[in-house]
Amino acid sequence: MHLENDNHRFMNIMKTERDLQGEGGGGTLGNLSTSTTSVDIDRLDQFKGSNDFILVEENNRSSTTQAIKSWAKRKVNSACTRKMLHRRVPILNWLPKYDSSCAVGDLVAGITVGLTVIPQALAYSNIAGLPAQYGLYSSFLGCFVYIIFGSCKDVPMGPTAIAALLTYQAVNSKGPAHAILLCFLTGILQVLMGFFGLGFLIDFVSGPVSSGFTSAVALIIITSQIKDVLGISASGATFVDTWRSLFKDIHNTRTWDTVFGVACIAVLLIMRLITKVKVGPSDTDTPPSKFHTVVNKFFWLIGTSRNAILVVVCGFIGYSFCANGEPPFRVIGYVPPGLPTVQPPPFSHTTNNNGTVESEDLLDMMADLSSGIIVIPLIGLLEDIAICKAFANGKAVDATQELIAVGLSNIANSFVQGFPGAGSLSRSAVNNSSGVRTPLGGLYTGILVILALLFFTPYFYYIPKSTLAAIIIAAVIFMVEVKVVKPMWRTKKSDLIPGVATFIACLVLPLEYGILIGIGINLMFILYHAARPKISVEKLTSHEGVEYLMLTPDRCLIFPSVDYVRNLVTKHSIRQGIPVVIDCSHIYGADYTAATVIEILTQDFAARDQPLFFYNLKPSVSSVFEGLSPKEFVVYYNHEDIDELLRNKSCIKKQILNV
C-alpha cells in the first residue's frame, strides 16, 4: 500500500473526526466507546491499526526494466550457490556418505530390477510398435544419467507401458526415427519445464482423472496385446478401433499361440502370488528362524524374477521347436546384436514408399508427432512423481528436479536410439522391496542391459511373441484402479464424474484428448466452486439491542463469484431490512471486478439508507476496494465497535476503526 493512499485515508479520518466532535475537537475520536483504541493522527508513525496492517513507504518506483534486471540477478545469484548445486545434482549429497552396506543393497536391487526390465523392455517395444531392440536401447543410458540428477532412490528410469502406448499413438507407424526424435523432444521440453519451474502443472491432474486415465491405458494395452496372444494381426488407434480389428480377424486365431499365451498369463499370476507366501510363525511377536527367512527370500526372489524366468523357459521351448523345424507359434525373430550407435537423434527423415522417395525435415516430423510432444512429457512427469510420492516416506518431492532428471535421461536415450521413458511403478516396487539404498542401483541395472545387448540378443530370436504379450497383460491388469471407486463414492460422489469421464474419453478418443477432457471437467468443478462460495447468514443483536445481519463468505472475492455474492447480500438485506455486516475474515484476495461490485453494493445500500459495514477486512483487500472510492465504505476490526457504528450510522461517511 503506497503512502499516497495512506495520506488520503488519514485525511478522511480527520474529516470524520471533525464531523463527530465539532471544530473544537482534539486529535482523537472522543465520542467512541472506551473499548475502541484511539487513533492519533498528528504523526504518521503513531498510526495504529489492525495487526494485519502493513504500511510500506516507497518513494521511488523501480522501472520495469530495473525490476526484471533485479529479478534476473537474484535468480543468477541463487543458482550459483552451493546449496543450489547440491539440490540440482543430488549425487553430491549422498555419494560422500556411501558405504559398503549401501553398495550391497544397491547391487542386489540393481540386478533384480535388471532381470525385470529386460523382458519388459522387449515387451514394451512391441506396445510402441517398434522392433524389440529399441526397448533395450531405452533401458541403460537413462539409468546412468538418473544416478547423477535423480532425487528418488526408488525410481528406475526406462520404458513404461503408458509411455510406450503414447509413443505408439504419436508415432502412428512412422517408424523408429520419429520415436527417437520424440524421445529427444520430450527430454528437451521436460528440462525446459524444470528450468522454468512448471512442475506444478501436474497439480491440475487430480486423483480421479489420473485413476481414470491409468485404468483406460491399462485396458487399451491389454487389448493391444490380445492379438499376439491369439496369433492374429490387428491394429487400431483407439480401444474401440482395436476391438473392431480383432473381431474382423478373429477367424485366423492360432491355437498354439493362444494356448501358450493363456498358459503364460496363468503362470505369471501364480508366480506373483508366490511373493506373498510367508513360511514361519504367524505371530508377529515371534521372530522367524534363519531357515524360514531363507525360504521366504527364495519365494520372493522366484516371484520377483517371474518375467525373466518365464522368458528363459519359453525361449528354450521356442529354441527346441525351431531346431526341429518351423515353430507352431510366432517368435520375436532377429534382434540385432551389440550396442546401438551413439549419434544425434534424426532431425530429418527419408523413406522409400513404393519407389517414391519422400523426405521430411524437422518441422514435418514434429507435425507428424503432433500433441504427443506435449502430452508425453506431462504424463511421464505424472508417472515419476506418483512413484516418488509412493516411496517418499513423508519427505517432500521436488517436481522440478525430477523434471530435469527425467528430461536429461530422455535426451541421453535419444542419442542411443531409445524411445521416451519415465519411472516405472512396477519396477520401483521391485527396487524398493529389494532394499535399494541410493540411485546407484541403476548402475547395475544398466550394466545388465548392456550385457544382454552384447551377448544374449541371438537367443531373443526364439522367445514366443505370446510370452511377451502375457508378460504385459499380467503386469498392466493390476493398473485398472477399480479399488478407488468405493472410497470416492464414500467420500465425495462428484469426484467420480471427472474420473469416469476421463476413463470413457480415453477409451473412445486418442489418449491426449481423453486426459484433456478430464482436466477440463476438473477445472469446471474448480471454477464452479470458486464462483459459488458458501455464505453463512446470522441474525445477531448488538449489546445495545440493535438487530443486524452478519453475512460471512468463506473464500476470496474474484470475478466468477462477486455477482453471486452481491445477489445473495442484496436478497437477504432487502428481506430483513436491518443493518448488514459482511464478515471478511476469510477474504484474502480480491480483484477489479470485485471492487466494482462492492462499489455498486455500497451505492445500493446508501440509496436504501440501509447501513452496510465490513468487518475484519484485510488491508490489502481494502486497498483494492478503496481504489474506486466506494460510497460510505466502513471497515472495522473490533466486535465492540458495532454498537458505536450502529449508533452513529447517520453521520459516518467513511472511516476505519482499529484495534
Can you name each region flagged by the protein language model?
Residues H2-K534:
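Transmembrane helical cores of multi-pass ion-transport proteins
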Residues M1-L85, V89, P533-V659:
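Cytosolic C-terminal regulatory domains/tails of membrane transporters and channels
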